[in-house]
Amino acid sequence: MKKTKETLKRQYTKKEADLHLAFELSQKTWRLGFSDGNKMRFKNIDARNLEQIQEEVGLAKERFKLKGDIKIVSCYEAGRDGFWLHRYLLKCGIENIVVDSSSIEVSRRKKRAKTDRIDARKLLMMLMRYHGGERRLWSVVNVPGENDENERNLNRELEALNRGRTSHRNRIRGLLIQQGLEVKNPSGKRFLEELESLRTWDGKELPEDLKARVIREYERLRMVEEQMSFLRKEREKRVKSAATSSLRKVAQLRTLNGIGKTSSWDFVMEMFGWRNFRNRKQVGAFPGLTPTPYDSGGSRREQGISKSGRGRIRALSIQIAWGWLRFQPKSKLSLWFAERFAGGGSRIRRIGIVAVARKLLIDLWRYLEYGVVPEGAQLRPEI
């Protein structure tokens, strides 16, 4: 008698869990999908209601007739809900993974149905496949510890404030340029005095409401700059304390010429502080600096870098790569760039600097993990 596909699937698929649980998260309601490997069950609960989660898990056990101490595995997509749910599930004895949503396979049709039930079913089926042995099915997020996640707030707040400062400065310039006026430094201490002396094209003072709006915008700008100054001082205070391993890594990075206060902090808190890279390929791939080939049949082309990961770290690494060429001209990496790319045009140099950034991150990782100084690099003298 021939075996059906379903029978073969059950026979040759290793069952690593008794109950699978997938979360489809949204603002007001969460969709929960359960399966014992054969049947499925879907329920809606109020968002962030932990009591309902425990209740539905118990009902799922009864539905699937699971008794005793069973193994439960779960998953949800990484997003704005962060990692608190992951930590809660682990505390409850549920083995949870957080999945990169961009790595989930979807239909390539021009139009495809999308509902919470369909998404929950898809997550649930992929979770069973993942624990059935398909480990490369999707990308699992490396969840930071609570302290590591907390330490990232300082540099991310500085990043947000810096964007806000640029917006305030541009808004002030835009309001004045509408009257044919231009100021060099909208955040200067004497800006208000300069504002009083400004005159329009016909010699008149600025309209009262416009002047009042510019003044309020200036006050908001000054407040943002004061907060940025406070955060920078707090950052230096923490580095001097060297209270954690991450802070000691920040101080270690600063011993290299070309690595400044901001870049050393961002690299450690976002990348080197708590992520466990196993090899140089993972280091280069994290900020999205690795190539993306397209080689199918007779079609072969390069699609550029993958641009995965945080754009801030990718942009910062390229910025620091240019600085490395300037402040470490005798290093092996700088000499390699000069030999391969310096003689070409601007386009060739831009391609080359991406390779420098990728290689530099690998060298910085080796320096922090194994104490190997980048070849030819100069260290700052101890003060």
Regions picked out by a protein language model, each given a short descriptive name:
Residues 10-35, 123:
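Gly/Thr-rich phosphate-binding beta-strand-loop-beta motif of the actin/hexokinase/Hsp70
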Residues 35-71:
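Nucleic-acid-processing active sites and adjacent nucleic-acid-binding tracks
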Residues 69-79:
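Short glycine-rich phosphate-binding loop at a beta-alpha junction
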Residues 97-140, 194-195, 299-308:
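Short alpha-helix plus adjacent loop in nuclease-associated cores
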Residues 151-252:
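Glycine-rich, often acidic, oxyanion-interacting loops/wings at catalytic, nucleic-acid
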Residues 249-255, 261, 265-349:
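Phosphate-backbone recognition surface of nucleic-acid-processing proteins
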Residues 298, 338-383:
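Low-complexity, acidic/Ser/Thr- and charged residue-rich accessory regions of DNA metabolism proteins
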